[in-house]
Amino acid sequence: MDSIIFDVDGTLWDSADSVAAAWNLAIKKFSSLDITLDREILGSVFGKTMTDIGDILFPSLSETEKDSLLSACCELENNYLKNHPGIIYEGVADTIEKLSKKYPLFIVSNCQCGYIEATMQAIGIELFI
């Protein structure tokens, strides 16, 4: 083995509740939609493209409105996670630090820009990956 690649959600932490809280704030602030997202709803769209997520969660909005709201949700989410991190799995930070001494470590995800950085900062592993 010459390196290790990690996914984020379900591997390093569980951010579903924090992401739902951030998206609900964005929805209330930037739209007139009367919806509340939770971990179950978000779990059903995690892993999909942002276009698909917008189509599923915000079907009544125009494409422009969806894009704008999704942008706001993602931006607010990345900032929110810095102060309200997900549930960090036990031993993740220590394990990452130890592994980094022997292997190059990488994170890959199909998430929006800034999410991996917010995750690494929240967990405290940005120096090791």
Tell what function each PLM region has.
Residues E126-I129:
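Conserved H-loop
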Residues D2-V8, L12-E90, K101, Q112:
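N-terminal helical cap/lid subdomain that shapes the substrate entry/recognition surface
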Residues S18-A21, M120-G124:
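Short, glycine/charged-enriched secondary-structure capping and boundary segments
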Residues W23, T95-M120:
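Substrate-recognition element of Asp-dependent hydrolases with the DxDx(T/V) motif
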